[in-house]
Amino acid sequence: MSRIGKRIIEIPSSVQASVEGSKLLFKNSKEKHELETHNRVKITLENNQLSFQPVGEDAQSRAYWGTYGALANNIVTGLSTGFSKTLEVNGVGYKVALGNKTLDLSLGFSHPVKYPIPAGIEMVVEKNTITIKGSDKQKVGQVAAEIRSFRPPEPYKGKGVKYSDEVIIRKAGKTAKK
């Protein structure tokens, strides 16, 4: 059984947290996030420490307990340090450029791919490396997955968009007939 819910979340001085009923509000100097929790989870905020308790002893309450503990921890981590994902673009003629609120990708199609950068996401492009930064872990991961989906890496030459820590399992090409 997982014990994620038992963790006490330390809230750093750069992040302010408050509880309003079943709603958790987090903010720092730039952004604010709110988390609507289920009524099967009791929230306690004391001395910059956030903890959750399941209201019932059933499996559903314990599931919510761990889920909301992890979500709150991700928000606190995002507001204090942030999250980032790095993508690499590999291939002949594949290029990446940052436009005005768009990411311009040349990925071998007959047209350039223009990806609008969502609010709360910051992108840095160096050569053929895209770094996606933000305070919302889900949004950073979603944006990275959407950009990767335009041209996923192929197993023969490794061309495409891949995560920097992703390992592409290569296949051998066809062999010549004898």
From Swiss-Prot:
Belongs to the universal ribosomal protein uL6 family. Keywords: Ribonucleoprotein, Ribosomal protein, RNA-binding, rRNA-binding. NCBIfam families: L6_bact. PANTHER family: 60S/50S RIBOSOMAL PROTEIN L6/L9 (PTHR11655), LARGE RIBOSOMAL SUBUNIT PROTEIN UL6M (PTHR11655:SF14). GO terms for cellular component: cytosolic large ribosomal subunit. GO terms for biological process: cytoplasmic translation. InterPro entries: Ribosomal_uL6-like, Ribosomal_uL6-like_a/b-dom_sf, Ribosomal_uL6_a/b-dom, Ribosomal_uL6_bac-type, Ribosomal_uL6_CS. This is Large ribosomal subunit protein uL6. It comes from Helicobacter pylori (strain G27). Pfam families: Ribosomal_L6 (PF00347). GO terms for molecular function: rRNA binding; structural constituent of ribosome. Part of the 50S ribosomal subunit. This protein binds to the 23S rRNA, and is important in its secondary structure. It is located near the subunit interface in the base of the L7/L12 stalk, and near the tRNA binding site of the peptidyltransferase center.
